[in-house]
Amino acid sequence: VYLNGNKSFMTNAVNSKYMLCVARNAADDPSLRENRSKFSMWWVPLRDDEGNLTPGISMEPLEKIGWNMGNTCELHMEDVVLEEKDLVGVEGNGFMQAMVNFEVERLIACAQSLGAAECAFEDATHYATQRVQFGKPIGKNQLIQEHITEMYMKIENMRNWVYKTAWKIDNGEPVQIDSAVAKLYCGRAAFEVCDTALQVMGGIGYTK
């Protein structure tokens, strides 16, 4: 089996030894190439034990304006040799297998959003107790207290969505809807919490 094509936005590719790739048979009728049943999932070795890239694979790191704790790359594959045993699951079922994986990945994204919101909340509340204006900490002002309350409320809602969805996954319950709604809410709420934290901290919130 020879794998050809490109894979964009692969997280931590620089540090990964393997990747999962969903691909179709190049010999398929072009009119059927978008058919979901034509995609299969493959286990692709990225590098050997010495760290050398697999022949036929090259990668380019992408520069991002944020999320710099992990690298993101674009991969190029040209006649990468795979064996039949590298097929993951059932041939032609790769798309549906990926969709099932996405349910767990959505939960991971929710947990990341929750963590970012909690960090912003901690920084903002600490600053509100330390920054003194007109003889008292700004946290004594009702507007700041309202901001902190709103942030806390959203974080608790985010945490409940994460725990509820994780509990369902652990108990083998379907989470197609829960994981999608959780990702939507947690991503939106995390942005709102971080934005509010910036308002509480003022200009200092924009510094490193």
Give the location of each predicted region.
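A short core secondary-structure module
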Residues: 4-57
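Short intrinsically disordered coil segments
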Residues: 35-37, 60-65, 88-97
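Flexible, small-/acidic-enriched active-site or ligand-binding loops
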Residues: 50-80
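Alpha-helical interface subdomain recognition
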Residues: 1, 74-76, 90-93, 99-208
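Short coil/loop residues immediately preceding or within conserved phosphate-binding loops
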Residues: 16, 39, 59, 72, ...
